[in-house]
Amino acid sequence: MANKTILFNKHLESNAKMVDFHGWDMPLNYGSQIEEHNAVRQDAGMFDVSHMTVVDVIGNDACAFLRKLLANDVAKLKVPGKALYGGMLDENAGVIDDLITYYLTDTNYRVVVNSATREKDLAWIAKQSQGFDVTVTERPELAMIAVQGPNAKAKAAAVLSAEQNTAIEGMKPFFGKQAGSLFIATTGYTGEAGYEIIVPEDEAQAMWQALLDQGVKPCGLGARDTLRLEAGMNLYGLDMDETINPLAANMGWTIAWEPSDRDFIGRKALETLRDAGTDKLVGLVMEEKGVLRHDMPVFFTDSAGVEHQGVITSGTFSPTLGYSIAMARVPNSIGDTAEVEMRKKRVAVRVVAPNFVRNGKQAF
């Protein structure tokens, strides 16, 4: 039996096409993936992300524990509510998961991890927490709704109370705040402004309906994938996993090398990889007809005339740009052109930074 979120019946009411997503019954689309994608780029859309795992890390050693657990450094977080993105690595510097950590107080942090990795993550976190004065608590009674797009904040404001709107007024990107029963964060997975709202399960259906009534379009996993890919955001399991280190997954910016005496898990292996040089994750753009797809081989010739090969990790047709885009893992000697093998022939592609669309506009 697949797991169902508290919003399952709301999806059926909107004629969602449901699919199995890592053991969860989730909406793929509600009729038109393209319309859902465009709603987020041009107006406002919402996603049921209640399958995500919310974990509270509380105790005197919460900061010290997370400084060991994560490659990014939570000690950088000084303002209550500030969030941090980064990887949780194994001893070989493979990425166990990518996650967001919110600093609430010196002894209270909230971590949001992926659903596909839930059991593995919880077991790893529990194992690593031994010896630290911390309590790690999963919060399955909380649902989550992401409201994204240029008009998302205004439409969400219409369903929030006056007190909640006052509490989050002027909140900068990548912050989260408890406002009444809701935890409202200025985070997302689309490259647009908006909120991710953690809501008690018994309030989630009413909130979903209230957002629907404000004209927020329900969006499924299909649009979520094209939006995050346009924004150059990794999908765990495709763009990185335990066989891939963060330097080869465009996550170098999330590694806090300083202070040099912070011994986070995987640090020694990662330093060795850094010094030796690793592959890198780049963006590909193909303006010819056709669609770049996961696992297609990528070829390029370096300045010395030597041919190298890489692979597409994520690819799709970009509704915003009108042509195909992809992320690919390649040797770091790549220039600004390459070829992708599709249908037994090689097609020219441009190599760009893996960030294609931000706030509705081309970003490269």
UniProtKB/Swiss-Prot annotation:
Domain of life, per lineage: Bacteria
EC number(s) stated in the UniProt entry for this protein: 2.1.2.10
A Gene Ontology molecular function term of the record: aminomethyltransferase activity
Alphabetized InterPro entries for the sequence: GCS_T, GCS_T_bac, GCST_C, GCV_T_N, GcvT/YgfZ/DmdA, GcvT/YgfZ_C, TrmE/GcvT_dom1
Keyword line: Aminotransferase, Transferase
GO terms under cellular component: cytosol; glycine cleavage complex
Keyword Plastid: no
Catalytic activity: N(6)-[(R)-S(8)-aminomethyldihydrolipoyl]-L-lysyl-[protein] + (6S)-5,6,7,8-tetrahydrofolate = N(6)-[(R)-dihydrolipoyl]-L-lysyl-[protein] + (6R)-5,10-methylene-5,6,7,8-tetrahydrofolate + NH4(+)
GO biological process, one term: glycine decarboxylation via glycine cleavage system
The family this protein is said to belong to: Belongs to the GcvT family.
Stated role: The glycine cleavage system catalyzes the degradation of glycine.
Quaternary assembly: The glycine cleavage system is composed of four proteins: P, T, L and H.
Protein name per its UniProtKB record: Aminomethyltransferase
Protein source organism: Shewanella baltica (strain OS223)
Lineage: Bacteria, Pseudomonadati, Pseudomonadota, Gammaproteobacteria, Alteromonadales
